[in-house]
Structure formats: structure tokens, C-alpha cells
């Protein structure tokens, strides 16, 4: 009899535990991760704003010199007057996956495909100016400074077949010729380098953030974090910010490498998920998404958590910041805008697939891509559908334009052209109704005839305006 009662009790407990665990999980998912912020606490509006324009000479020479455009990684370009409808100018084939977008300087696009080929592509023709082959994989954007291209590399080829302890490297190449200037060997790098002054910063799978002399390729200092670093470093007011796979966000003194503060993601059952996303610095705050689907705002000076907003199943994308709004996408197929001060959601757009790569705000439109394969083996929901690039009105979230290719971080630009990054191709677009400034005077006498020829060619224009919307809204 006693044995029977014990068996019944054990069975009851066994049935109860999963239910209790599920209850905790749902409670944790639904309520714990939300904290509303305030515009009166560590919200700085007197600093240089993300949408502030740069000097014209800088825009022409270095239109998009690094991942996220600026050292704060804001992914916002206010310098360009580029909107649809577009005319397709050229297509460049990289022959393998382009996981990160190119950087643009000196009239060239600099980009690496996943299997070790690095290209310099002419911005007007789409032709290869030079290329190099390396025996390492790539999942980052280069950064360009002082006519040198710096790029970080992961483990040796073939990709994803070596343990994560395999070595990586950073290379410095002459922007004009591609000549190798120096090479720094360390752990594998899945981060886009950042150059501040004479120092390059990059985080590695070996848990270290390296500060490297850009002239010699020798380390100035090294900081050891609590986990792998996939998050590219961002800079503001003398500090370097980055996240780790252990769920920590660090702020270091850029000159000395000394830790200024460390913040952490909220935990579930005693563990934290990771910060794969690159932090974005604006308004005296650090905005960063966690792989648990939570978007955070931390004080850039204090490290204090100011707000935390539940956004979706996973966040791998860096955020873009523009006019008091924070833009981010999730693996359950939503793209959203949040109030930068409070964390309140302003609008939400449903895409065809998971959103994995960083958005870009260009001339009031926010561009992002839908990734059909991202998260296909994930434990939480990941939306599977068609791939493509969306352009939404950044104020309202209404769709303005669509392009059928695009998987990761799809859009960069210079003063004349928009570049959309597909799975393995780059597409160059120009606005249909604007002549090139260098030829504008020559074209004036032939405006009517040229207009008719342009109209005849408009059938070749790619990209789809959204029904019932104006591209200028």
C-alpha cells in the first residue's frame, strides 16, 4: 500500500514539474523582460545626433567607410538624397555568400565573400579593380581609414568545419592596389573592425578584444571578456562598447583598455543568452538586442539598464537609430520601431521571413532584408518564407519599395547610388529622375529627348513600389 502511494506521488510530481517549468518560462517570457524607460533619465539630446550631416568633403571621399557608417554604428545616412523609383545600373557577382555589406571609399566598394575572396569594385561600373584570395572565412565588413582597408577573418577554410578555437587574423591592405601591408594573427574574428585615431579595435572568439596599432599591426593592449565576442565594437566619448556570448555588455576606456563598466542581460533559470548584435550608441545610450529577443537600452556613461522591451523570438541584428527611434528586426519575421527614450513600440511590420541583418536608414527610408534560412534549426519560432529587401517609411512603417533579393544586411549608399546586397550579388541603383551632377549641365539642352529615352528604358527598372504608396512619402 505504501509502495503504491509512493508511486502515485512520484508520478504526480513528475507530471507537475514540466507544468511548473512551463509556467515559469511563460511568465519569464511574458513579463520579466519588460522595463519602461524615461526621457528624463540619461537621455542626452545635446550631443551630435545620428541624423546630423557630415562635411561634404568627407561624404565624397568616405561615403560609407565602416559597418554601420559611423563609429557609433548608428546605421543612419542623412547625407544622401536617394529614393525610389530606382534604375538598376549594374550587378556584381561575388560567387558565394555575402554575409555583411561592403564599405565604400575612394570610389570603390570593398567587400569579402564568405570563402575568402576580397574584392575592390568600381562604384560606377561594377567591375573588379583588384581582388585577393585568403585561406580564411569571412563574416564581417571592412573598415577604411587613411587609404588602408582593414578586414577581420574567421577560421581557415572550409568554413564551419573547424572548432571555434581555430585561428583567425586581421589584414591591412592598400586601398588602391590591394597590397598586403600587415597581418595580425589571433583567434577567429567574426566582428567588423573599428578604427579610432591610430588604433584598430576588434573582438575575437578567443574572448579577447584587441586594440592594434594601425601602422604596425602590433597590439597596444588586450582585454579578456567573459565569453566569445561576435559583437562588433562601437565607440563614443572615449569608450569602446561590445557584447559577448555570455550575455554581458562592456564599456572600456579606449586608450587604456580598462573596464569602465559591465552590464548583463536579464537571466532565465540562472542563465543568460548572448549579445551577437553590435551595440548602437545614440542619445547617451547603448541600444543592443539579445538573442533571447529582448531589446535593451543602457546608459552609455553608467551601464545602468534604462529599458528592456520584449521584441520577438531572437534578435541578431544591430539596431539603427534615427530621429528618436530605434529600429530592429526579429526571427519571427517582424521589423519594429521603438521610442528611444521609453522603449515603447511605435509600429511593427510583418516581413516574409526572419530578419537577421542590420537595417539602414537612408534619406528617411529604413531598409532591411528577410532571410528565409535563418533560424531554420532554432529551438524557438523562426519565420520561413521568401527572401527580399524592404524599404519602409521610417516614420510610419509603411512599405515604399521592395527588391526580390537580400538576406542579411542589405543596404549601403554613396552620394549618388544605393547598393543592395543580395545573397551573393550586389546591385547598384540610381534614382530614375535625377541626372548625375557631373553631367547635369551637359544634359540640359537635351532634357526632353533624354527624358523620352529614360522613359523607354524604365521598363528595365527593377524593384517594386508598394501598392498605393508614394516613394516620396
Go through each PLM region and give its residues.
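Conserved core beta-strand positions within WD40 beta-propeller blades
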Residues: 63, 108, 148, 199, ...
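Hydrophobic alpha-helical membrane-insertion segments, chiefly the h-region
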Residues: 15-26
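Extracytoplasmic beta-rich repeat domains
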Residues: 90-103, 131-146, 152-169, 180-196, ...
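N-terminal Sec-pathway targeting helices
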Residues: 1-15
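Aromatic (tryptophan-biased) beta-strands that constitute blades/sheets of beta-rich domains
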Residues: 6, 25-99, 110, 117, ...
Amino acid at each position: 500500500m505504501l509502495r503504491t502511494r509512493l508511486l502515485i506521488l512520484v508520478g504526480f510530481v513528475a507530471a507537475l514539474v514540466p507544468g511548473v517549468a512551463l509556467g515559469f518560462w511563460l511568465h519569464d517570457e511574458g513579463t520579466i523582460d519588460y522595463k519602461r524607460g524615461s526621457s528624463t533619465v540619461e537621455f542626452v539630446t545635446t550631443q551630435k545626433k545620428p541624423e546630423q550631416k557630415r562635411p561634404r568633403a568627407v561624404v565624397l571621399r568616405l561615403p560609407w567607410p565602416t559597418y554601420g557608417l559611423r563609429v557609433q554604428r548608428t546605421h543612419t545616412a542623412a547625407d544622401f538624397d536617394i529614393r525610389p523609383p530606382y534604375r538598376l545600373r549594374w550587378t556584381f557577382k561575388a560567387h558565394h555568400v555575402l554575409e555583411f555589406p561592403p564599405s565604400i571609399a575612394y570610389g570603390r566598394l570593398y567587400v569579402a565573400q564568405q570563402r575568402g575572396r576580397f574584392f575592390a569594385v568600381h562604384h560606377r561600373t561594377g567591375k573588379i579593380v583588384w581582388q585577393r584570395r585568403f585561406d580564411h572565412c569571412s563574416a564581417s565588413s571592412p573598415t577604411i581609414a587613411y587609404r588602408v582597408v582593414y578586414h577581420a577573418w574567421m577560421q581557415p577554410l572550409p568554413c564551419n568545419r573547424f572548432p571555434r578555437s581555430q585561428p583567425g587574423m586581421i589584414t591591412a591592405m592598400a586601398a588602391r592596389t590591394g597590397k598586403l601591408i600587415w597581418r595580425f594573427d589571433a583567434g577567429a574574428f567574426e566582428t567588423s573592425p573599428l578604427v579610432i585615431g591610430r588604433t584598430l579595435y576588434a573582438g575575437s572568439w578567443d574572448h579577447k578584444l584587441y586594440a592594434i596599432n594601425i601602422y604596425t599591426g602590433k597590439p597596444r593592449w588586450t582585454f579578456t571578456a567573459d565569453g566569445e565576442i561576435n559583437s562588433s565594437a562601437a565607440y563614443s566619448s572615449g569608450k569602446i562598447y561590445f557584447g559577448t556570448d555570455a550575455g554581458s555588455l562592456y564599456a572600456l576606456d579606449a586608450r587604456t583598455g580598462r573596464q569602465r563598466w559591465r552590464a548583463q542581460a536579464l537571466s532565465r533559470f540562472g542563465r543568460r543568452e548572448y549579445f551577437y548584435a553590435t551595440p548602437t550608441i545614440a542619445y547617451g545610450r547603448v541600444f543592443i538586442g539579445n538573442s533571447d529577443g529582448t531589446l535593451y537600452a543602457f546608459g552609455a556613461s553608467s551601464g545602468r539598464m534604462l529599458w528592456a522591451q520584449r521584441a520577438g523570438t531572437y534578435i541578431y541584428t544591430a539596431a539603427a537609430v534615427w530621429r528618436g527611434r530605434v529600429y530592429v528586426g526579429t526571427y519571427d519575421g517582424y521589423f519594429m520601431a521603438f521610442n528611444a527614450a521609453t522603449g515603447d513600440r511605435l509600429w511593427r511590420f510583418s516581413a516574409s521571413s526572419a530578419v537577421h541583418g542590420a537595417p539602414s536608414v537612408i534619406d528617411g527610408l529604413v531598409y532591411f532584408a528577410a532571410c528565409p534560412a535563418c533560424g531554420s534549426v532554432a529551438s524557438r519560432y523562426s519565420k520561413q518564407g521568401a527572401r527580399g529587401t524592404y524599404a519602409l517609411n521610417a516614420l510610419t512603417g509603411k512599405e515604399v519599395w521592395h527588391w526580390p533579393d537580400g538576406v542579411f544586411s542589405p543596404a549601403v549608399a554613396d552620394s549618388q547610388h544605393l547598393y543592395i546586397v543580395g545573397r551573393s550579388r550586389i546591385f547598384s541603383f540610381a534614382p530614375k529622375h535625377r541626372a548625375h551632377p557631373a553631367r547635369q549641365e551637359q544634359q540640359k539642352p537635351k532634357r526632353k529627348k533624354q527624358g523620352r529615352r529614360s522613359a523607354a528604358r524604365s521598363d528595365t527598372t527593377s524593384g517594386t513600389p508598394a501598392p498605393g504608396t508614394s516613394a516620396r512619402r
